[in-house]
Amino acid sequence: MKTTPFTDVHIALGAKMHEFAGFNMPIEYSGIIDEHMTVVNGVGVFDVSHMGEFWVKGPNALAFIQSVTSNDASVLPLGKAQYTCFPNDKGGIVDDLLVYHYEPEKYLLVVNAGNIDKDWEWCVSHNTVGAELENSSDRTAQLAIQGPKAQEVLQRLTPVDLSSIPYYSFVTGEFAGCKNVIISNTGYTGAGGFELYFYPSDGMTIWNAIFEAGKPEGIKPIGLGARDTLRLEMGFCLYGNDLDDTTSPIEAGLGWITKFAEGKNFTNRAELERQKKEGVTRKLCAFELQEKGIPRHGYEIADAEGNVIGVVTSGTMSPVLKKGIGMGYVKPEFAKAGTDIFIKVRNKNLKAQVVKAPFRK
């Protein structure tokens, strides 16, 4: 298994470790619910060094990004980030990712850990405009410091005014005495906070400084288990569950990152444009259970008569709502908020109601 600069410290702290996307990663420390609530109410630190980072450089950098991603990067100012996806040639999604506009002719793509090799091959094979591509995944470490107290803690460690960095914006500066740290106002938790990108050799300096600075706020390390429950409470999609090679961004409710701007001829644009105009045969919806139970990935979704109308893609017991929540694909007529649906849990059909995400307001 691959390791991150923080693997040894996770083990030393007693984390429950497990393989994830080929990496030995911490799933939980003190327990998923405790860690979840730490982030919602205070501040927690996630090791997300397993994520992938690709640099796109040169005069044709923007042209390349426009040809392989669904969102419109031509309107992305310097110092801003954008959520987008790589559409595939069958109407599905290669991966969802973030694009950072780093310099006038330099962009950073941040991709999912489980898709690094697939994404890299996709980018290289679709680089018809001669952009300069660099896979720096193994040379980049990343921590996500999330929660309402994150900014307060991190401000003690940098001369950069964190309050001046709007959501989905970033700066590169000094942090904990380390140079060239990307400080990004982004996250996958809905609780606020920052993501830091830095050299692996600076990893433990930054880790130790953050935990020392955050002692008064009761800062804790957080595992991937709580990362999943936090993102699900926000209705954020997870690749491999809610998105994959067969789900289109239109079906997944990601029409807002699928821009049909003039001259933006990304992969399979015509098919996605057709879907937007004519409609789709299934839609991703969010739902809350009205009865006791926990929906899980792969459970069937039924109508009142027991007819199967879809499938659960993500589900959990919400630590904040204290009820079962989930997302799944259903026939479009069942995707509207307020619609009653039923989740097949073992031998029972548990009543649920479609809601508008996020679950945690």
From Swiss-Prot:
It holds the Pfam family GCV_T. One of its GO terms (molecular function) is aminomethyltransferase activity. GO terms for biological process: glycine decarboxylation via glycine cleavage system. InterPro entries: GCS_T (IPR006223), GCS_T_bac (IPR022903), GCST_C (IPR013977), GCV_T_N (IPR006222), GcvT/YgfZ/DmdA (IPR028896), GcvT/YgfZ_C (IPR029043), TrmE/GcvT_dom1 (IPR027266). It comes from the Bacteria. Keywords: Aminotransferase, Transferase. The glycine cleavage system catalyzes the degradation of glycine. Belongs to the GcvT family. The glycine cleavage system is composed of four proteins: P, T, L and H. NCBIfam families: gcvT, PRK00389.1. This is Aminomethyltransferase.
